Curated annotation (Swiss-Prot):
Sites where the protein binds phosphate: R103
Keyword Nuclease in record: no
Binding site for Zn(2+) 2: H157, H159, H204
Function: Involved in 1,2-propanediol (1,2-PD) utilization within the bacterial microcompartment (BMC) dedicated to 1,2-PD degradation by catalyzing the conversion of propanoyl-CoA to propanoyl-phosphate. CoA is regenerated within the pdu BMC (for use by PduP) via this enzyme, although there must also be cofactor transport across the BMC. Directly targeted to the BMC. Phosphate is probably the first substrate to bind in the forward direction. CoA is probably the first substrate to bind in the reverse direction, and might bind to the enzyme as the BMC assembles, ensuring cofactor encapsulation.
Binding of Zn(2+) 1, residues: H48, H50, E109
A single GO BP: propanediol catabolic process
UniProt protein name: Phosphate propanoyltransferase
InterPro entries per the UniProt record, alphabetical: Asp_de-COase-like_dom_sf, PTAC
Major enzyme class: transferase
Amino acid sequence: MDMQQETIERIIRQVLGQVGPAGGSIATLSGDAGVDPFQVAVGVSNRHIHLSRTDMDTLFGPGAELQRKKAMKQPGQFAAEETVTLKGPKGSLSKVRVLGPLRRETQVEVSVADGFALGITPPLRQSGQLDDTPGLTIIGPQGSVTKDHGVIVAQRHIHMHPSTAAKLGLRNGDEVDVEAGGERGGVMHRVLIRVAEASADEMHIDVEEANALCLKNDDVVRICKK
């Protein structure tokens, strides 16, 4: 097979959504990431922050509103134009993206390596589980705020629509294994299933996990039920 023909066939497979794990580029609201119903597209999360209304006012000025930069696959969620600096006991991280919409409580999501750089040890947690977590100082253009908790390393998880969960025999809170193909492929254990009506089927991992398996946004992995 010559190079041109091979390229054409690869493009056709991608368009049809039939590329194997870690080889596709598929985004869907229905969960059909290909012929195999257990396939799901990957979203890679870099460090970011979710802000409360009170902290938004302190950092960006009273009544400030987030400016949309880019829509995310989860309905209603977006990356904002606004960024902040995170300052810990040891160091700081600049240009940390704010994600919208605003939340009830401020939550910072970083990698393990980010924790080393900041001088804190954030635990591996589900989103929203902020008890007994470290804090830091958040610096914005109009002010700063020091939090006594709220920093986590996010547990890898799969957002899933109820119709997909029913089809796969999964429930909210289940944990599954997920297989990634490719030269640096492997199996990720204890991947949390998060089922909600306002969800698009997508697996969320952080940059460290993505780098370890050579995964990027929209690559396709496969759910392996325990």
